[in-house]
């Protein structure tokens, strides 16, 4: 029997959640491939992608889970929150209802995720300034109330997209991994589980291909 070699040092499962149509899939496409699709169809169930970062000569593999926002898929998508240690909870700044539903998404994530986690609240579609229904202050206050980071992004013009993901991972690394040992139960499509041991970590230095900023609660 041939044993598979694990080609990374750390594994980090992050889910992207929020109402249908807020731009979750395009945020991931912009972050992963620097692509944006006009008229992109809504996600059905769950889509999965990976991204590997090289940090201080260590490979960090991100599992990025794009979940459907429609109510009919809730029973499917919630099962994929298991083992997640990070979430981007996304709303559309031009859609008040998507903001009003944040409490629901936050509750579902906290009920199913790993006991230690980090959350980034993302007000997406910041390019739709003339149609804004949710102020930046409202987003910031919601994030502070629930102990989350906050940022506004535009998948269309790529504004703050990379920063949103990187700041979340930075928070997770320093707050959950640094000088701490954790075992993460990673659910691989519900088929099998693998325990990834996260050992003692030193302060990280990203190579020139990646930029990590200190966690922030607001941005322009």
Curated annotation (Swiss-Prot):
Protein name: Ras-related protein Rab-11B
Gene Ontology terms for molecular function: GTP binding; GTPase activity; nucleotide binding
Any one GO BP annotation for this protein: hypotonic response
InterPro entries: P-loop_NTPase (IPR027417), Rab_GTPases_membrane_traffic (IPR050209), Small_GTP-bd (IPR005225), Small_GTPase (IPR001806)
Gene designation per UniProt: rab11B
Family: Belongs to the small GTPase superfamily. Rab family.
Lipid-acceptor residues (S-geranylgeranyl cysteine): 219-220
Membrane topology: Lipid-anchor
Gene3D superfamilies, per database record: P-loop containing nucleotide triphosphate hydrolases
GO cellular component: endomembrane system; plasma membrane
Entry keyword Ubl conjugation: no
Alphabetized Pfam families for the sequence: Ras
Deletion phenotype: Mutants exhibit normal growth and development, and endocytosis and the structure of membrane-bound organelles is unaffected.
Binding residues for GTP: 18-25, 66-70, 124-127
Motif mapping: Effector region: 40-48
Keywords: Cell membrane, GTP-binding, Lipoprotein, Membrane, Nucleotide-binding, Prenylation, Protein transport, Transport
Main location: membrane
Subcellular location: Cell membrane
């Amino acid at each position: 029997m041939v044993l598979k070699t694990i080609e990374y040092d750390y594994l980090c499962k992050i889910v992207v959640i929020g109402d249908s149509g807020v731009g979750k899939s395009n945020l991931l496409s912009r972050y992963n491939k620097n692509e944006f699709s006009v008229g992109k169809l809504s996600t059905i169930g769950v889509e999965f992608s990976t991204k590997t970062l090289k940090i201080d000569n260590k490979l960090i593999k991100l599992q990025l889970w794009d979940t459907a926002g429609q109510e009919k898929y809730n029973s499917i998508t919630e099962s994929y929150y298991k083992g997640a240690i990070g979430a981007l909870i996304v709303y559309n700044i031009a859609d008040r209802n998507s903001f009003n539903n944040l409490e629901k998404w936050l509750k579902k994530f906290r009920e199913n995720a790993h006991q230690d986690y980090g959350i980034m609240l993302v007000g997406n579609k910041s390019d739709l300034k003339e149609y804004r229904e949710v102020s930046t202050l409202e987003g910031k206050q919601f994030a502070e109330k629930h102990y989350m980071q906050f940022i506004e992004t535009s998948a269309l013009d790529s504004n703050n997209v990379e920063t949103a993901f990187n700041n979340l991972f930075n928070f997770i690394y320093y707050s959950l991994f640094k000088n701490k040992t954790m075992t993460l139960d990673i659910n691989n499509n519900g088929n099998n589980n693998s325990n990834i041991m996260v050992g003692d970590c030193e302060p990280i230095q990203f190579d020139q291909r990646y930029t990590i900023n200190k966690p922030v609660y607001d941005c322009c």
